[in-house]
Amino acid sequence: MENNVRYTEKLAKYMLLAAGIALIGGICWMFKSVLAYILIAVVVSLIAKPIMSGLQKINIKGIRIPHWLLAAVTLLTVLGLLSTLIILIIPLISSIVKDVSVTNIESAAKSIAVPLSDLNTYLRTYFPALGSGFRLEVAIGEEVQKIVNISGFSSLIGSAASLISSFGVGIFSVVFISFFFIKDDGLFTDIICALVPDRLEQTTEKAISDIGHLLSRYFTGVTIEIFGVALLNFLGLWLVARLGINAALGIAFMTGIFNVIPYIGPLMGGALGTILGLILKYSSAVPVGLDVNFWAFTAILIAVFCFTQLIDNILYQPLIYSTSIKSTPLEIFIVLLVVGHIGGALSMIIAIPIYTVLRVIAFRFFGHVKAISRLIPSEKLISKE
C-alpha cells in the first residue's frame, strides 16, 4: 500500500513538473519576440563587456566617470562598429546599381561569351549526361527562377511597411535593454536567480558567471575575426585584384560577416565576392580590376579568398574556438556537424554559444556524474570558486 502511495506521489510530482515545463514553454512561445530581444541584448552586452571593463579603469584627476555614462559610451561604440559594417556595404550595392547599365551588361556579355562557350563545351565533353544542348547560364537561370517566386512579390511589398515598423521596434528594444545590461552586469544574473529555488541559487550564479566569461571572450573573438578576415580580403582585393577602394571594402566586410557561419560561410562569402568582383570588372562604366583575361581575374579573386581562409584556419579560429571557450577542435567539429544536420547552415551560427551554455550547466549541476566530470574537467571553466 505504501509503495502504491509513493508511486502515486512520484507520478503526480513528475506530472506537475511536466505541466510546469509545458506552461513555461507556452509562455516563452507567446512572448518569443520579447525573449529574442533580451537574448540579443545579452549578446550585445557580452561583446561590450571588455570595452566597459577598459573604460571603468579610466580616472580623470581621481574622479570616476559615472557608470551610466560609461555604459552609454560603450553601447555607442558597439553600435558604431555595427553601423560601420552596414555603411561600408551599402556603397558597394549602390555602385553596382549605378554603374551597371544595359550598355555595360551587353559589353560584359560579349567579354565573357567566349570563356562561357569554352566552359559549356568542356562540360558537355566530359559530362555527356548533361546533353548536347546543355548551357550553364540557362541551367542557372532555371534554378534561380524556381527559387524566386514572382507572384509573391506583391505580398512582399504589401508587408514592407509592417516589416520596417517591427524592425524599428526591435532595434529600439535591443538598444534599450542592452544599455541596462551593460550598466548593471549583474542584472541578468539577478533575473535568472529570482526564478530558481534558493538551494540552487549559488550554483546558478556560478554557472552564469562561467557562461558570461566564456561567451564574452567568444563573441569578442568572433568580432575580431570578422574585422581580421575583412582586412585581409580588402588588402587582397585592393592591392592585388585592383578593385576600387569602396568596392574592395564592401566585398571584404561582406565576406567577413559570412565568415561567422562555420565551414560553409567562407565558401558562400568567397563565391559571392568572386561574382561581385566579376560584375564590377565587366559591367562597371569606369574600368576597374587588374587588366587580365576573364579566367586569370577569376583565379586572382579566388586566390585572395583562399589565402584569407588559410590564415583564418591557422591563426584566427584556433584562438577563438579553442582558447576563448576552452573546447577542443574535435568537440567543435562534432557539435557543428550535429547542429548543421538538424537545423541547417544558419543554425550553425548559434551552435557554439548554445553548446557552451549547455556545457557549463552540465558541469555545474551534474558535475558529480562520472561521464561529465571526465569530459568537462574543472580547469575548462574560467571563474574561480
List the model feature ranges, each with a label.
Residues 160-276, 280-282, 295:
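Alpha-helical transmembrane segments and their immediate interhelical loop/hinge regions
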Residues 286, 290-385:
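Hydrophobic alpha-helical transmembrane segments of membrane transport and translocation systems
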Residues 1-95, 99, 355-385:
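Anchoring transmembrane alpha helix of integral membrane proteins
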